[in-house]
């Protein structure tokens, strides 16, 4: 049984009220449903974070690294509370705050990280790995707008941006100190140095991969795994020289290019630009992930000689 079973309804009610005050400057009486949802999500996220920190004190014998372009995670508040054994306590706490728990759960948007069967399969694997107590990290992109929201106007489908992060970012823990750098374009040359062949990459465009971690709770266990989502950012927010010359749009080109990588899940690819963007997404995602896995392994063991013994890498593809 998870330790979280010891968390009472009263403790959750007090914690949610504290988050409403600290993060939004409101009381439960005048908070919106959206604010109550975010406060509750932060409380559950902090519980997961404590469990994950406790669980990560020792290096695992072997860790699974699961790469997928999409994870159809759905909504997390009710699911995580249920998995932690505090679903009834959370429902009661919300009602004690004068809210309908069903309304608060309904307020949460689906995480805009997946679309179909491939994403649902990936999410099921993450849930199962956590439930079985298998150390695992999932990797994907932190899509800003998901795929799209569908609206029917005059009998026709209209696609609208899915701004899920407006509320969904309550689950994310950005870790800029663990950012990786991905290089696009440029040229490669080789040279010999003291009998060793050196490969040099030059004149490339740099894009930062900022990890935003989402914690995944297993059912009826204290084991928690991580879904690491990469957010693409330019290391140079703006070209000040071009901006000073009045070339405002061109001054933002580098930032716009970087941002586009993690904006939309499955951008339209019936034209060259769309195909190019999809390729950039996949290259960016894989490069950042492998750099992260390698860096963390070296930090833990100081060598790559045992890499194959400590890591299993699986790509979710069809």
Where are these regions (language model features)?
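A conserved ligand/cofactor-binding region detector
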Residues: 1-318
């Amino acid at each position: 049984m998870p330790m979280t079973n010891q968390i009472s309804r009263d403790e959750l009610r007090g914690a949610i009220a504290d988050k409403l005050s600290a993060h939004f400057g409101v009381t439960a009486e005048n908070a919106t449903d959206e604010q109550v949802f975010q406060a509750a999500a932060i409380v559950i996220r902090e519980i997961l974070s404590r469990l994950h920190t406790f669980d990560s004190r020792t290096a695992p014998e072997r860790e699974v690294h699961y790469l997928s372009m999409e994870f159809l995670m759905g909504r997390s508040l009710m699911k995580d509370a249920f998995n932690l054994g505090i679903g009834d306590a959370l429902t009661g706490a919300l009602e004690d705050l004068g809210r309908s728990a069903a309304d608060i759960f309904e307020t949460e948007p689906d995480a805009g990280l997946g679309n179909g069967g491939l994403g649902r399969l990936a999410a099921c694997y993450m849930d199962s790995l956590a439930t079985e107590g298998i150390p695992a990290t999932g990797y994907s992109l932190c899509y800003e707008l998901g795929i799209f929201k569908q609206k029917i106007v005059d009998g026709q489908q209209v696609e609208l941006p899915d701004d899920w992060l407006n509320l969904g970012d309550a689950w994310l823990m950005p870790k800029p100190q663990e950012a990786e750098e991905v290089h696009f374009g440029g040229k490669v040359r080789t040279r010999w140095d003291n009998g060793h062949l050196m490969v040099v990459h030059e004149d490339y465009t740099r894009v930062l991969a900022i990890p935003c971690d989402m914690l995944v709770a297993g059912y009826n266990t204290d084991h928690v795994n991580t879904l690491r989502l990469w957010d693409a950012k330019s290391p140079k927010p703006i070209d000040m020289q071009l901006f000073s010359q009045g070339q405002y749009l061109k001054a933002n080109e580098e930032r716009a290019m970087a941002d586009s990588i993690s904006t939309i899940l499955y951008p339209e690819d019936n034209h060259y630009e769309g195909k190019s963007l999809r390729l950039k997404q996949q290259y960016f995602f894989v490069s950042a992930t492998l750099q992260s896995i390698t860096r963390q392994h070296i930090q833990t063991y100081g060598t790559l000689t045992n890499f194959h013994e400590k890591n299993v890498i699986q790509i979710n593809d069809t």
